Amino acid sequence: MAFVDEAKFFVKAGDGGNGCVSFRREKFVPKGGPNGGDGGKGGDVIMVASSKVQSLIDFRYRSHFKAERGVHGQGRDMHGRGGKDCYMDIPVGSVVKDSETGRVLADLSEEGEEFVVAQGGSGGMGNPHFSSGSNRTPRVATKGKLGEEKWLLIELKLMADVGLVGLPNAGKSTLLSKLSAANPKVADYPFTTLEPQLGMLHFPMRNSCIIADIPGLVEGAHQGVGLGHKFLRHVERTKILVHVIDASADDPFSDYDIIGNELRSYKEELADRAKILVLNKCDEFDFDKDLLPDFIEARGLEPKNVLFISAITGEGVDKLVKLIGDIIDDMEYQELKQKREEERLQDLKKQKEEERRQELKKQKEEEQAKDE
């Protein structure tokens, strides 16, 4: 199945039902009052983030989504039923934009998260609303309001914990297949991977994590060169970036700098993302490790986060798995620690507010006692 991470489509919320002009027609009641019902509200168009949907491919075959209009009001004070909402399942990690302005309307990054992308029109009012002392037989009702309609753009940003980045033919796809059960297309020529590939990395005694192989970036990718510009947004949500460098290349350090510059040019905060440097194909080339300390220091890397591996033979892959797991564990610990600190500060704030309220209450009671 093709991987589609961008789609344009049209949504139309339901129009409101019209109000009704009607009067009581009963035996022995020659001049019955108005009893026209109100129109029902039009249905909304609602987007729902669902893990069951992995791609936007369905939008290739259906580009228009419409909610049901509200039912018209009827006589005998019968109000119209509201129109049924139109629910759209989209992948978790989708960003919804206004197609014309490019303004971000929603970022659905949690399972089950919902967003009303188009509001249904309100129902029209029946003629009882227009009855008055001077007009007991109003022959007027209002029409329902039109539902919202608009063209929208969805961009999918993969919800991966780890992103594999590197120049074409650095060995990312082979590494992904070693790390997970994924089976990406692998060959010895650039741009074999034409779309992001996902794999699941399982740890003993830990939760699993998702790894994404981002298609080969090249110099100038953030400006539209090569294929990488189409997929740079998929690295935004990753917790860890694994830079896969071909150790047998003419200048592997330069290759690292190219990717680092592209990520930084696309979004500055990516420069501060947790990084692992993997020098791949160490079985094919005797790398001069004496050059490594100066490079690590100049780029601000942590020595323990620099590994030599061979994705083909599996050499060093176990160390990489352990390192990824350790970094994720540390991140989760720091997140939990921060959350608990925020809760502690919130509780302290509430405690001080309560003490202040009690103090004011006591002062008020003392003042009342003096007045008495």
From Swiss-Prot:
It is an enzyme of class 3 (hydrolase). Its cofactor is Mg(2+). PROSITE patterns: G_OBG, GTP1_OBG, OBG. It is found in: Cytoplasm. Its EC number is 3.6.5.-. GO terms for cellular component: cytoplasm. GO terms for biological process: ribosome biogenesis. GO terms for molecular function: GTP binding; GTPase activity; magnesium ion binding. Mg(2+) binds at S173, T193. Keywords: Cytoplasm, GTP-binding, Hydrolase, Magnesium, Metal-binding, Nucleotide-binding. Residues 121-141, 346-372 are annotated as: Disordered. Residues 1-159 form the Obg domain. GTP binds at residues 166-173, 191-195, 213-216, 280-283, 310-312. Residues 160-329 form the OBG-type G domain. PANTHER family: DEVELOPMENTALLY REGULATED GTP-BINDING PROTEIN-RELATED, MITOCHONDRIAL RIBOSOME-ASSOCIATED GTPASE 2. An essential GTPase which binds GTP, GDP and possibly (p)ppGpp with moderate affinity, with high nucleotide exchange rates and a fairly low GTP hydrolysis rate. Plays a role in control of the cell cycle, stress response, ribosome biogenesis and in those bacteria that undergo differentiation, in morphogenesis control. Monomer. HAMAP family: GTPase_Obg (MF_01454). Belongs to the TRAFAC class OBG-HflX-like GTPase superfamily. OBG GTPase family. This is GTPase Obg. The gene is obg.
